[in-house]
UniProtKB/Swiss-Prot annotation:
Record's function text: Catalyzes the tRNA-independent activation of glutamate in presence of ATP and the subsequent transfer of glutamate onto a tRNA(Asp). Glutamate is transferred on the 2-amino-5-(4,5-dihydroxy-2-cyclopenten-1-yl) moiety of the queuosine in the wobble position of the QUC anticodon.
Lineage, broadest ranks: Bacteria, Bacillati, Actinomycetota, Actinomycetes, Propionibacteriales
A Gene Ontology biological process term: glutamyl-tRNA aminoacylation
Native source species: Cutibacterium acnes (strain DSM 16379 / KPA171202)
Name this protein carries in UniProt: Glutamyl-Q tRNA(Asp) synthetase
Residues where L-glutamate binds: 31-35, 67, 203, 221
GO molecular function: ATP binding; glutamate-tRNA ligase activity; zinc ion binding
Amino acid sequence: MPAASPQLLPTLPLVTDFATTHSGLRHAAGRFAPSPTSALHLGNLRTALAAWLLARSTGRRFVVRIEDLDRARVAAAGKIASTQLRDLESLGLDWDGPVVRQSERLDLYADAVAGLETYPCFCTRREIAAATTAPNEADWRPYPGTCRRLTVQQRHERLTTRAPATRLASQLNTFEATDLARGCARGRVDDLVLVRNDGTPAYNLAVVVDDGLQGVDQVVRARDLWSSAPRQAQLAELLGFIPPVYAHTGLVTGPGGVRLSKSAGAAGLSDLVDSGIDHRQVVAWLCRSLGLPEVADPHELVNNVALTPPTPVAGIHRLDPRPLGGAMGWWSDAVLDVAVLRETRRP
């Protein structure tokens, strides 16, 4: 009896109708989308300010989304998210419309997956690492397509030992994404995970669906996430959305070049306030770190500051403690760039 063909799924349209069936008429927007795992540190707040300024200065809405799908890490998601929102308000950052929570949008993610060409994947992270070459940027290892080549019988056998994740059956190896500093750049794409093996929608799926449905057409984030931009842009196009323009900022670090994180001791806004530093001082420092005039109210900068042309993607920058009284023991190699705050103003 001949072996079953590994082509198990019907060929679906390259572009689904998900966007047209789920999207209403929405004005363009920027966004800030924290995960409620801990309080926002200065690096997070700097990204939020940059995203808010870029949106407001280009005539866009600004939306806030809580990315709370990781059940293991967001046990106290409600309380932490409330703290994060208060911190944004304390700095003078406002947003349009209700705050969206990913945990309340599971049906939308399921609908998106239903229209895509997918296959089950049984590989563990260790197996993927062993089957791939050295990782690319940001320690990303493209999936080698192991489970895509399985026969029906092989998949049935693996189902008895492990629940599968769901992967996109990509038809491409590279895809182009647009970054305000890089311009149009082509990057590697692979069969990314859409649904984890515990049934949780994967980050890349949820963020693309939400950006598309919320009208987000500009995304400001740290440059270590650049490697995901081509994959997310491809998925957006497959779902019928126009991929956003990205603005990847220089990565802010603490002592020793370690990326800021609460687990590594990075200070949150409440830590600074408790040490005697006023919210307005924090805003002024964040503006200074972006190469902008030091103001206590970010609204003063909207439509009143010339945004400089983009420069090459910023490198790694360390925080300067001097404007904040040295309370956190950080330093700076250079003034942080304003290059990402550049786009033709919308009429």
